[in-house]
Amino acid sequence: MTDKRPPARNARSGYRRTLPWRVVTGVSEFLDRRIGWDKLPVPLGLGTLLGLRVKLRQENLHDTNRIPAVNVPEPAPGNGRSYLVNRTADGSYNDLDQPRMGMAGTRFGRNIPLEQIPPVSAADVLSSPNPRVVSRELLTREEFIPAETVNSLVAAWLQFMVRDWFSHGTSPAERPWTVPLRDDDPWPERPMQIMRTPDDPTRDPQEAPAGTPDTRVNVSSHWWDASQVYGSSEEEQRALRTGENGKLRLWGDDGTPFPSDPDRDPSRVPGFWLGLAMMQTLFAKEHNAICDHLHTQYPGWDDEELFQRARLVNAALLAKIHTVEWTPAVISHPTTVTALRTNWWGLAGERAHNLFGRISNSEVISGIPGAETDHYSVPYTLTEEFVAVYRMHPLVRDDWHLRAAADDSTLREATLRDLAGPEVLKVMDTIPMHDLLYSFGTLHPGLVTLHNFPKFLQEFERPDGHLQDLAATDILRSRELGVPRYNEFRRLLRLKPAASFEELTDNRDWAEQIKRVYGGDIEKVDLTVGLYAEKLPAGFAFSDTAFRIFILMASRRLNSDRFFTEYYTPEVYSKAGLRWIDENTMGTVLLRHHPDLRAALAGVKNAFSPWNVAGRE
């Protein structure tokens, strides 16, 4: 099928363009430039972030579907009109007027104007400077730099979320990028090869106007729908379900932890490691617990009804945990903690929500869940810039001290290599899950900064035997996908670019290193390097520049999804389902399935903060 829809309206079409809102956005940008939102008192900082978000919604949402497409995916609802009240497997029919919006197989959008994305050449991707040189000289971890305010479940959770949000798909073996290597480079292959991102199968080269930027598709659903637990197709979903009481299969149910079909073995998928396996197991169990609860409340519901309602509840619980627990843990500035809680409960707060429910239609007063659906005049998708700023591999440790929750005794000293791929199965067979979770909860992750990239991931052997330097790959990917370099990225977000290497970072040694690698040209500094180098706001584990994309996209994932907005109702979720979301946190989920963690979590307000170490006063 060919898609030649008329161009979508830009966000600039009128969203909050009245004089009072122009004053709000103008004052917000002035205060941010002159003082910084993070240095303002919390109430003024919140107002500034509100104004910045309005401006980002006006200027930084851009629809790649304006470029003509062919062979676009077809929405295929399953049972009659069940898609009206259930999430479809592929994400179609979330928007009832544009059923293809956000479904698996549709294009990534952009947070920068399409006309600002120049055509990408091989020289752009492979030189100025070589991605491998950037990896070795600026990203290599010499000594682990911890993020001391959080625990390593932060890293596991992020990858768990990423598996839901986006994937460019399996790279083709043909035409790899060939990266030349220096004579002293220990890489065992000459030259280094990095597989290309798959082309956009919906691209129509004859109809696309000359000079339009490359596009790519998301093989996952763009929606926050827990597709990493439930799959992105009817076929995947059927394979995961037991067919009884709405429940999912758990690893080990039939004596085998994974499907016998090697093509469906998740341990053979690149990027699979213990942290991801633990989160997938935990929330498959949570789905089944929700099914049990709903079955007691509504005994007449059949397998299909229980599954669909539990999926809605589980997906919303994941979104809530990410919004009010994970993100405040990694950006624990008082202003951002309040802002994130406001996204979910509004300024009225959690207590008012629990007592009275929504007291206003405004998302600012009563939060986004239950408010009106709003795409801000641009069809919803995740974006290539969102993908780029979520490249946070430094969160992952290289060395793991696995210990018992009961007494903190050593069970195993392991490296990341021991906890990745098929090796995960051996670990899960020999160490109880509560001890693995305890170990993660009492170990710090890495800080997202220069010289802190996991060594194992710089010499990563994929399940297919292909060697990969993920640090070099991260640099190359942003270039390949047309994501601007650091200074231009900041300009397009209306932020001041770095005038010098010393202005980019307050670390003098880093400034000299970056200057040397980039030949003294500040404009060439890659986005990832700039994000990792800049000074962090108080309480942040990642950069303020990346945070600007989160200001925009974190709320958009909720605002655009009718199952978080107009359909976030007792009629769709059930009263018991909404209560489950309200009453649960990451901590209650952990304790429901692993009560042996009670002492470790005692007094811990946020399960992503460091846990209690057994035997320590």
Residue ranges and their predicted role:
Residues 493-497, 518:
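Alpha-helix capping/termination and helix-coil
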